[in-house]
Amino acid sequence: QNGQTGGSSDGSQNSDSSGKSGGSSGTGGSPRPASGGLRVSGTMLTDASGNAVQLRGVSTHGLAWFPEYVNKEAFETLRDDWGANVVRLAMYTEEYGGYCNGGDKEALKQLIDDGVSYATELGMYVIIDWHILSDGNPNRNKEEAKAFFSEMADKYAGHNNVIYEICNEPQNSDWNGQIKPYAEEVISCIRQYDSSALILVGTNTWSQDIDAVAGNELDDDNVMYVLHFYAGTHKASLRSKLESALNSGVPVFVSECSICDASGNGGIDYDSAQSWLDLLNDRGVSFLAWSLSNKNETSALIQPGCSKTGGWTEDDLSETGRWFRKAIQG
């Protein structure tokens, strides 16, 4: 492990943000406030006071496709009714309307700015997600990524609640040969402006190959490595990969997951979902549910017929939404 120590404030401000203590249950509404920026300590996240923190929350769908869910009422509902303490802003890079594919960059950056503002006002953490998908090798749009994260880190260096996720789901990209060198370059851009922000790095095979990180970690003491799972597809073998990584001292963050199959559709596997949830809570691993949308697919948290963009009742939520609301509430 690269000398990771928790509790050092490292220049992070101490304005209140919010965090949920690892494995806490029954906290209901608002999560326990945490002080200051997040630090990696061993495999755990800690707040500026050194208390263990588990983030639990929700990811948007693509910002270009479902921008209406980036609003204060939506985030407030997630915080107060679901008990969420983090929201992830998923900005696709290569898909239709994507940042690197002719999308409206200024509109996308404005949505991110709105999302950061609402989260900050509500005392929540917020993840800025460079959502690579069809561009499976993160180096494909590396220069764009470096410029984007330099701009974001410069803009939000005064915030201690902003988390940077630099490559959502790499594929066919070797950790040592492709992803790690990319991460080193992008992280150095962020660190020019912000020495202490938490940075999340995706892993190969749609962020499943976290085993490749052990012994090959990045030389930065506030990085976590990303695992994504869809409980209908990913079961015991991926859970054991997670446990092995944690046991090797690799800090893991689940920035996206759901309880259906990996297409985001299909049936729900409640048994596998519960096994995942038990493991995440047992090990204090942070997790975010995909996705805050009413898309007609199993993983969407809102019913397809519901046009409300906040203030949802249980009846407005899909089966997946109801399950995650309880999971996040603890």
Tell me what each language-model feature is.
Residues 47, 129, 256:
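Acidic active-site catalytic centers that drive phospho-/nucleotidyl reactions
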Residues 8, 16, 20-22, 53, ...:
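A ubiquitous, low-specificity "background" feature that marks scattered single residues
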Residues 37-38, 62, 67, 125, ...:
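Extracellular glycoside hydrolase catalytic/binding regions
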Residues 32, 136-138:
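Membrane-targeting and insertion segments and their boundary/processing signals
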